[in-house]
Swiss-Prot record:
InterPro entries: Ribosom_uL1_bac-type, Ribosomal_uL1, Ribosomal_uL1-like, Ribosomal_uL1/biogenesis, Ribosomal_uL1_3-a/b-sand, Ribosomal_uL1_CS. This is Large ribosomal subunit protein uL1. The lineage of its organism: Bacteria, Bacillati, Mycoplasmatota, Mycoplasmoidales, Metamycoplasmataceae. GO terms for molecular function: rRNA binding; structural constituent of ribosome; tRNA binding. One of its GO terms (biological process) is translation. Part of the 50S ribosomal subunit.
């Protein structure tokens, strides 16, 4: 832990905490200050002027990033339809299960996957296990495209690399835009798409400054402030 702490302190010295960096410079600095031995994730964090207790100020969804997110995502599809089971397997789903198999997986706590995609008919069953799936971030939701009559298409999009976004109770949105191994231009394109999406989704009831703060960081690196246009 002491070694990690020392590396983080060294990385922080490269960042002026009072400076707001242009987006491309912030991306380059996030990569430079990543000291992890693995291929670190690069994340954006928005602090938004939202009161998420109000239904018209809740923000949640997903977008397809132009260069993917660099992450290998294991997808489980839940459907009783033989046709959808077949097409989902062909689309690249890692696991395809029916109603009974789904319940068995949840009961046995065998969560060897990152995302559940369900056809709408499976939701009554999944709803019973909301307290188990919710905290793990596995509960399917129509807003993120994981509850759909076309799970095969959802699998293709997820495998390409989607960015999920959701404002927490403080109005903070964290979202993955890629990996350290990706080029600066790829991360820049992905970041621009996400930023434009968040801007476009500003609720009409919000007055004043919408994006209060925007930062970027690697998995184990310091936060870097981004200059907003």
């Amino acid at each position: 832990m002491a070694k990690i702490g020392k590396k983080l302190q060294e990385a922080k010295k490269l960042v002026d905490k009072n400076q707001f960096y242009p987006l491309i410079e912030a991306i380059q600095l996030a990569k430079k200050t990543s000291y992890s031995k693995f291929d670190a994730s690069i994340d954006l964090a928005f602090r938004l002027n939202l009161d998420t207790r109000k239904a018209d100020q809740q923000l949640r969804g997903s977008i397809l990033l132009p260069h993917g997110n660099g992450k290998v995502t294991r997808v489980l599809v839940a459907t009783d339809s033989p046709e959808l089971q077949k097409s989902s397997k062909e689309a690249g789903a890692d696991f395809v299960v029916d109603k009974l198999e789904l319940e068995e997986i949840i009961k046995q706590n065998k969560f060897d996957f990152d995302v559940i995609v369900a056809d709408p008919k499976m939701m009554p069953i999944l709803g019973r296990y909301g307290k188990v799936l919710g905290p793990k971030g596995l509960m399917p939701n129509p807003k993120t495209g994981t509850v759909t009559p076309n799970p095969d298409k959802a699998v293709v999009e997820i495998k390409k690399g989607k960015a999920n976004y959701r404002a927490d109770k403080y109005g903070i949105v964290h979202s993955l835009i890629g990996k350290k191994s990706m080029s600066d231009d790829q991360l820049l394109d992905n970041a621009k798409v996400l930023i434009d999406t968040i801007k476009r989704l500003k609720p009409s009831v919000v007055k004043g400054t919408y994006i209060k703060n925007l930062t970027i960081s690697s998995s184990m690196g310091p936060s870097i402030k981004i200059k907003l246009d």
